[in-house]
From Swiss-Prot:
It comes from Mus musculus (Mouse). Not expressed in uterus. GO terms for biological process: epidermis development; keratinization; keratinocyte differentiation. InterPro entries: SPRR2. Keywords: Cytoplasm, Keratinization, Repeat. Residues 21-65 are annotated as: 3.5 X 9 AA approximate tandem repeats. This is Small proline-rich protein 2K. Belongs to the cornifin (SPRR) family.
Length: 68
């Protein structure tokens, strides 16, 4: 992994992309889907790490198109 990739990972991973579990489990996901705040140079994978599958399922109904 290059130095730049590591930098990107550090930038991307701590981003709070996923809403906290509690508001996420009922169909109370935040209406506006949080935009991917990662710089364009970041690899898509670390940036797109969202909720664990269990949480992501209910949340995805509110945020339909997250991958482009």
């Amino acid at each position: 992994m290059s130095y730049q990739e590591q930098q990107c990972k550090q930038l991307c991973q701590p981003l709070p992309v996923c809403p906290p579990p509690k508001p996420c489990s009922p169909p109370k996901c935040p209406e506006p889907c949080p935009p991917p705040k990662c710089p364009e140079t970041c690899p898509p994978q670390p940036c797109q790490r969202k909720c664990p599958p269990v949480l992501e399922a209910p949340c995805q109904q509110k945020c339909p198109s997250k991958s482009k």
